[in-house]
Each structure stands twice: as C-alpha cells, then as structure tokens.
Amino acid sequence: MLAVVFTLLLLGACEKVNRLAQAPTIYVEKGSYPESEVPEYLRTVSPDILFVTDRRAVTTREGKMNFSHERSPAMAFGRIEVNLAPGWSWSDLLQEQSANRNRMPAIVTGDAETLVQFSPTPLPFELKNGVARPLPSALAPYQEQKRAFQRRVSAELKRANRRDVVIFIHGFNNGFDDGVTTLANIWHSTGRIGVPIVYSWPADSSGLFGYFTDRESGEFSIFHLKEFLRALSSVTELERIHLIAHSRGTDVATSALRELVIAERAAGRDPRRSLKLDTLILAAPDLDFGVVRQRLIAEQFGPAFGQIIVYMNSKDGALGLSQTLMAGLRFGRISSENLGESERVIFKRIQNVNFIEVEQVRGQSGHAYFRENPAVLSDIALALRTGALPGSSERPLTRIDGNFWQLRKDYPLQVQ
C-alpha cells in the first residue's frame, strides 16, 4: 500500500505545471524564433487553443466556464484563450525565446467557449436483420454536429501557415487547463505550425485511488477519441495529423488509434492515407512493454504513421513506481540494455519507430521533461517542422544502437 501511495503522489506531483516553458535550445543558440512563418493573427501572447473533450462542463467558483474531471457522454468542441505571459507583449515573448533568460510566468486561461455540443453517445439505435443502426432522428443531428466541427477546423486550416493539426492528449491527474497550457507551450515552441487541438479526457480524479479512476476514465474516452479523429481526418483541407501523447494519455491514444487502424485495413484502405497520420509522439509512455509488443508491434501498428517517436528516461521515477505497482516494465523506461537479442531484432525491423533516451533529467522533471526540457522541445519542434528522422542533419541525435538514440542536454548544439 505504501508503494501505491508514493506512486500516486509522485505521478500527481509531476503533472501540475502551468508556466511558460523555457525557450527551446534551437532558438536560443541556433537562430531566432521563426516569427516570419507565424501568421499575423497568431502574433499574440494570447492565442486561442481549440479543444475536444468529454469532461462535464462546470462553472468555477470564480465564475469561469471550464470542465471538470467528471465524465460526460457527449463531446464538446470549442476554443479557449491562453495567455502565455500576462503583461508581456508579443515582442517581449520573442525576445524571451531568443535570450534564454529563463523567466517562466504563470499561464492564464480564459473561459472555455463551446462551439459545438455533440449529442450524447451511444446514439439510440434499432436492430434490423441483426444489425444495429442508429435511429435516423438521432443520427441526423449528430452528423450535422460533425459537419459544424469540420467547417470550423476547415476555416482555421485555411488561414494557418500549414494545413496540419497538432493534437495533444494529456496524462493522469491532468485537469482541463493542464492539457490546454501544455499544448500551448509545445505548439508555441514549434513556431505555431498548423492548428492546435487538445483532446481532454476526464482525468484529474482526487483521492488515493485517483490513478485507477483515471485509468478507467481513459477507457471510457476511447470511443469519443475515435469519433474525433474520424471526423477530423475527413476535413478536406487537412493534410497531416501530428499527435503527441503523454504518460497515461499514450494508452488512450494508442488504444483508439489501434482500433482505427484495424478498421481502415479491414475496409481495404491504407490508414496512413485515409486517417492522414503523420507523426505520433509518445512521451514518457505509461504502457506495459509486454502489451506494446503483443498489441502494437505484432499487429504492425507502426506503418500507419509517417514516424513514431518515443521519448524515454530510464530514471523516470514516476514510471518506476508505476512499474512496481503494475508489475510490468513500462515502455517509457526501457533502454537498449533492457532488450534481449530477439527484441533488438524486432525493433531494428521497425524502420519508422525511434526511441530517444533523454539525458540528465531526474526528480520532478524526470516525468514531465517533454514539456519543460529545452532540448526535448527543440527535437519536437524539428520533427514536426521538418519531418526529419533522427541522425539526419536536421535532427543530429547521437545513435546508441539500432533505432535507439540519445538526446543530450545541449542538443542540437554539440554532438559527439
């Protein structure tokens, strides 16, 4: 029981950071922030972040519209203003990104505005010849809600600098604002490419067993995530989806994606083309390594993406305790030394999947490094901006063995 307590406390403690991230190394040392590529309407310290959530809507004590940890049977799509640095101007923010003064003000979010409220699922249905079909009276408004969502995303893509969508799926013990502010940091670090959308599942349960409640809520959310991704991939203007998932969010993401990939292949379609999947980033994945081998690797999950990037830290204390609790090696803690010869052969065959060991991160930052570490933020930015693979001139990571790489503290400045 003591191990359970420590696990939950540490995992929770690593999730509550809502500050402007330290400037990525690439902008401080290798060149200025790419302002010229940022559309005029996005040159602000208070951009809008889009969201899709199946949390229950609430009004906070301060009168703010937000979403709780409770589950909702209906998805909501909307927007929320995120002030990355209250009191700063756009010029102040740019100077900070290039000067590395390490000032990290608290991020402030506004009211969450719902633009499309979806019908609750499952939709009412009837059986005909043994086949369940939604009632037309229920299906018609649901389809119109999807079209309204698609129209808004289409409009955003038409004025963006790229026809890409960057999705973030948070982990355990994250409130709605936690996911929103994390995506705002990552998206800003990339040079604000494409359209940012946070998928916020009903995590952030309190109490000793909140971790387990959140795990179940992740299972609850998988159908809604699939519906969101199906609707999104059908937007004509969309060219590429980049999906970033963290910790327990990697289970929610890969479970939904796995089912979508299976369905697309069964229908005779190439999921990479039909779902427009480009980059999948799994940061500190809280996944059982054995389950990954049998459900993802054995089912050829990888070819559905342009590339898959797994950020790992063998000293990730939160995943270490989760590993003790769940009695299975966590995917976010593996290293090349953990693998037997047969496993090395398997990973070498997976050409578009790369495992990146993040150097010199411990303690609280040992689990949240993907959103706090300037070197990791630099690599995410380079991967999404260029599509380059590790070891290329654009992403000069240090090879450890096969498709295992090391990301040094000063990356991408000095490579040995």
Where are these regions (language model features)?
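Bacterial N-terminal signal peptides that target proteins for export
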Residues: 1-2
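C-terminal motif of bacterial Sec signal peptides marking the signal peptidase cleavage site
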Residues: 10-13
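Lipolytic serine-hydrolase domain surface
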Residues: 19-133, 139, 158-159, 180-184, ...
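Alpha-helix-centered segments that form part of catalytic cores
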Residues: 140-153
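Proline/glycine-enriched tight loop/beta-turn segments at coil->beta junctions
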Residues: 150, 158-164
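The conserved beta1-alpha1 loop
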Residues: 167-171, 246
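Short substrate-entry loop that stabilizes the transition state in hydrolases
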Residues: 174-179
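Gly/Ala-rich beta-loop-alpha elbow adjacent to hydrolase catalytic centers
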Residues: 225, 245, 249, 253
